[in-house]
Amino acid sequence: MAQDIISTISDLVKWIIDTVNKFTKK
């Protein structure tokens, strides 16, 4: 169960980083 939460958080972090990169690399 903890692993599911960790993997979900890591997926969220990856998505946030990708989104931030898109906006900062105009």
UniProtKB/Swiss-Prot annotation:
It is found in: Secreted; Host cell membrane. Transmembrane segments: none annotated. InterPro entries: Delta_lysin. Keywords: Cytolysis, Formylation, Hemolysis, Host cell membrane, Host membrane, Membrane, Secreted, Toxin, Transmembrane, Virulence. The modification N-formylmethionine is found at M1. One of its GO terms (cellular component) is membrane. One of its GO terms (biological process) is symbiont-mediated hemolysis of host erythrocyte. One of its GO terms (molecular function) is toxin activity. Lyses erythrocytes and many other mammalian cells. Belongs to the delta-lysin family. This is Delta-hemolysin. It comes from Staphylococcus aureus (strain MSSA476).
